[in-house]
């Protein structure tokens, strides 16, 4: 009976240790700044003002860094 009680306590302690180790990575704090990958997939973060008209994905019509399939995005007011 004492052995099963010790085994139960040992398993509970191991569970608490492993839960505390993985908890910080599973839920990042809410006040953390947005990461680069989150900005990459956000369409509003990729709009750039190109001479008064907003363009999608940071490409302008007369710019050197024009990308393939560059389309004008609708204005923010829609």
Curated annotation (Swiss-Prot):
It is found in: Secreted. Residues 1-21 form the signal peptide. Transmembrane segments: none annotated. The keyword RNA-binding does not apply. Expressed by the venom duct. Contains 3 disulfide bonds. Residues 22-47 form a propeptide. Keywords: Disulfide bond, Secreted, Signal, Toxin. One of its GO terms (molecular function) is toxin activity. GO terms for cellular component: extracellular region. Belongs to the teretoxin M (TM) superfamily. The cysteine framework is VI/VII (C-C-CC-C-C). This is Teretoxin Tsu6.15.
């Amino acid at each position: 009976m004492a052995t099963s009680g010790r085994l139960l306590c040992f398993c509970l302690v191991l569970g608490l240790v492993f839960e505390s180790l993985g908890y910080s990575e599973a839920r990042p704090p809410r006040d953390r700044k947005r990461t680069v990958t989150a900005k990459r997939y956000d369409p509003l973060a990729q709009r750039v003002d190109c001479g008064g008209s907003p363009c999608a994905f940071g490409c302008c019509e007369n710019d050197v860094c024009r990308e393939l399939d560059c389309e004008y995005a609708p204005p923010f007011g829609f």
